[in-house]
C-alpha cells in the first residue's frame, strides 16, 4: 500500500471512529433519560441507627446525611431494651419519639425493632433463671447479647409485656413502615432446666406420648439406649462420644420450634395494634441448621 492510499485509509477509519463515538454518546444520553427500572420497582435502601448510642445533638446531622445519601428508611431500638424499660414495668419512649420525629423531618421511614436480643441487667439480676446454661455448666451473663433462654417463661412474659407497650405506642404511627423481630435470632444448645422440660414436652407431642415410637425413631435398641419414660430423657450431650444423632437432630428441631414460637408470639402481639405495618425478622444465613427458620408454615403469621 502506497503512502497516499495509507493516508486515505487512516482518514476514513478516523471518520468512522468519530461517528461511532458520536452514536454511542447520543445513545448514552438517550438511556440516561430513560431509566431501566421505575422507582417503584427498585429496592428501598436504608441504614441501622442507634440513637441511644449517640449524643442527641448528633441525631439531626446524621439523619440529614442519610437523606442526602439517598437512604429512605432507618431501623431503631434494635438493642435498646435498657433504654425502653430502665426499670421493670417503667417504660420510656420519649427519646425514641424524638428520633422518629427527626427521621421523618428528613423523609426517612422507620423500621421499629423489638429489643429481645439484649435484655437489661435488672432482668438478669432479678431473674437469673432466664439465663442460658451451656453444656459445661457455664451460665451466660449480662455483658454481651442473646444470653436469655427462649425456654424461660419468665423471660418470654417480660419480653411480651415490653413488645406490647411498644406496639401500642407505634402500631398506628404512619412514620413506622414495619417491624423487625429480635436480631439474628438463634437458639444455642441451652441446658437451662426449663429448656430440658420443654424438650421433653416437645418429644411427647411429636411422638404422641408413645415412648415406643420415640425408641423406634431413635434406634435405641442399639447400645441399650432404650427409654421407658419421657422423663428419663435429657438434653443431648454433644461433647460425649457417639451421642445418639437422632436425639441431637430432634433437639435441633426443638430449637427451631422454640425460635419460631417466640417470633410468632411477638408478631401476633404487634399485629393486634399494627394493622398497616409489616412484620419480619433478620438472620445470618450461615447459622447451623435447625437453629433458625423452619418451614414457611411455621412462620405464617410473620408477614
List the predicted regions and their residue ranges.
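Bacterial N-terminal signal peptides
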Residues: 19-29
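Short, well-ordered coil/turn segments that N-cap beta-strands
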Residues: 40-43, 70-72, 104-110, 172-177, ...
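Aromatic-lined substrate-binding rim segments of carbohydrate-active enzymes
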Residues: 60-140, 164-167, 265-273
